[in-house]
Amino acid sequence: MDDIIVGKLFKEIRESKNLTQEDVANALGVGRNAIVRIEQGTRKISADELIRLEKLYNIELHSFVNVGISNHNVKGIILAGGTGTRLYPITEGTSKQLVPVYDKPMIYYPLSVLMQAGIKDILIITTSEDQASFKRLLKDGKQFGINLNYVIQPSPDGLAQAFILGEKFIGDSPCAMILGDNIYYGNGLEKELQKSIENALDGYATIFGYKVKDPERLGIMEIDDFNNVLSVEEKPKFPKSDYAITGLYFYPKGVSEIAKTIKPSARGELEITSLNDCYLKNNKLKSSILGEGYTWFDTGTFSSLLDASNMIRTIEENKNIVVCCPEAIAYNNGWISEEELIEAGNLMKKNSYGQYLLELSQKKNENEAQKVKKLSLF
């Protein structure tokens, strides 16, 4: 595990255990100034130091190293190309993934999923017409504590094409891909993301299943009673199950090489189902089933776009949070400082999004610290 920045959360949990800076300094064999710097976010803390504190003071390592903190080399891809014809005339002048879903651009939702998985190096695949708009919105990702790269998709030739276009970016790393119009909500999602990261590091691919009423329209996975994948099919006339394969995938290193071996389907595309089938045939495909308590939206139609916006609004108003907020996730992960969070909040302080960021920076006591960790979770 890499050294990490824990910052304010470290201080809040230390105080909740009634520990002084001197106590922690003595336990780690460092000077008090080192603890001051850790709490200011200007000094990283190593895994060995965290484990030592865990044993001495009964502090769960997960309190510091949650799924969102980057402790792996998995890279991420957001596929944000396509023409969005199902949303015409809305998308005749802009990318589908830049259309608002309640209070934020659609692409914030898949971006937040990757960030929640601890992925900091992300490639955004766009059309040539829309790339400038994405760069204007997201820039290089520094404001979220991440590194954003961009590549143009010359033509929409199938989802698996993303791994060929991103081959240089991916290199020898495992990789996750999420579709730019997919939204996920569920309190246990972070655990499923962590499992998928671990699977990828161990050489396994992971696909996410969700029960639907019209499986014949989608890619489908057939599973047994233990959620083992038995087969995958692309829009079958007679589906073997009603579990759709959603637009979130994790793959081990080498995925680009496998993608290049896929032959185009009858409709001339490099199907993601064909890629998944390659892993299945080698007993390297696992499933993550999103059951009760989860919601998945493919926001490619008028009705699904409205449904997603209404759901996000209801959740945010009832819980006084902002769902899929990249700034909050970055802050919780220790990727940006409190000062950077406040700066972002001040830029948008005239609306509820900016006010949320400012409120987030003001959480002080132990109970509020625990809320801080969960405010932007799914």
Label for each model-derived stretch:
Residues 1-16:
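A short, Lys/Arg-rich alpha-helix, primarily the initiator
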Residues 15, 26, 55:
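Alpha-helical residues within the helix-turn-helix
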Residues 18-37:
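Short alpha-helical DNA-recognition segment
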Residues 46-63:
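DNA major-groove recognition helix of helix-turn-helix/homeodomain DNA-binding modules
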Residues 69-138, 146-148, 153-155, 189-191:
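N-terminal glycine-rich phosphate-binding loop and ensuing alpha1 helix
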Residues 134-135, 139-225, 250-253, 259-262:
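Conserved beta-loop-beta/alpha segment of the NTase-like Rossmann-fold superfamily
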Residues 176, 190, 197-198, 228-328, ...:
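Catalytic-core segments of class I nucleotidyltransferases/pyrophosphorylases
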